[in-house]
Amino acid sequence: MSHAEHATELLPWLRQDYERLVELKNNHKLAHAYLFGGQQGLGKLVLAKHFAHYLLCTNPVSNQPCGECRECQLLASGTHPDLKMIQPEDSSEIKIQQVRDCIHFVSQTSQRGGYKIILIAPAEALNINSANALLKVLEEPSNNTLLILVSHQPTLLMATIRSRCHLMTFNRPAAELVIPWLESKNIRASAAELLRMANNVPLRALHYADEDALHDRAVLHAVLEKLLHGQIDIAEAAGQCEQFTLEDNIEAMMLCASDILARNQISDSTATQTLHDHDLKNLAEFFQDAARLKALHGFYQELLKARRAISSTSNPNRLLVLEGLFFCWSATIR
């Protein structure tokens, strides 16, 4: 199995969450809308897809999709008419027309006679107009319709959206649940070491099996730390990161900020709050008080704005965008 082929497998560390959802369905207690919240790389969307496949399968075996019925065949080909996947398309935003399509989708009768399911990921990509439009779907659920919103930063969602969804929070799993899975992917590096470097985030650990990804990440973390120490200026920082695309720089900074913020969330256990990765731990030491954490949260929002801007038709100056982000990063500890 290649690294890209885990899209609908049941990830071992999510088995209990899956079984909980199946039990709710079997007891006729399934809510009409769920919000899967947690760090990027935990497999939240993988779980959402797997559960959707189970709900649509006409002949599940041991509470798993059979993989052989007509519904499973349609799902495998990505053409099942009763499953709608909403993700950013030509930009980093989920636009209002995509949500309007959802409104039409839920108003129609199921084409295959079962559930109608909408998966939205990442939900924080909803812009203000699409978020407001989604409220209509959440406020007026139709029978046998399920919405699952997947979010890496649930607090960025409108409070009215969060209040209309049943929240399921996902934390980093124990290493013993992940290491055998990583080893099954035929990686060359030590699974335990990759997981340690990824701070117990499984899909990120799999990504780090690519040695270039580890190197690129270390370079950016070093630049971010030097900025906070005042050892380099913004122009120098941008110059050291010019070798990477702006999209990659933004994604790496989002992961970094997300990790530090997650470390300070009460929902994480003491074990998973510990940042094992040396360079990331050094960065986290700068964010020990509420004011700086609030500033870091604001920086994450600036990253989201930048990601939207570079995907728009306005074609901003990419170097200026990167320098602006480094300025915002430096300002988080002022």
Q: Which residues make up each language-model segment?
A:
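Short, surface-exposed loop and linker segments with low hydrophobicity and enrichment for Pro/Ser/Thr
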Residues: 125-128, 135-139, 240, 244-247
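Charged, glycine-rich active-site and insertion segments that engage polyanionic ligands
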Residues: 1-53, 71-74, 143-146, 152-334
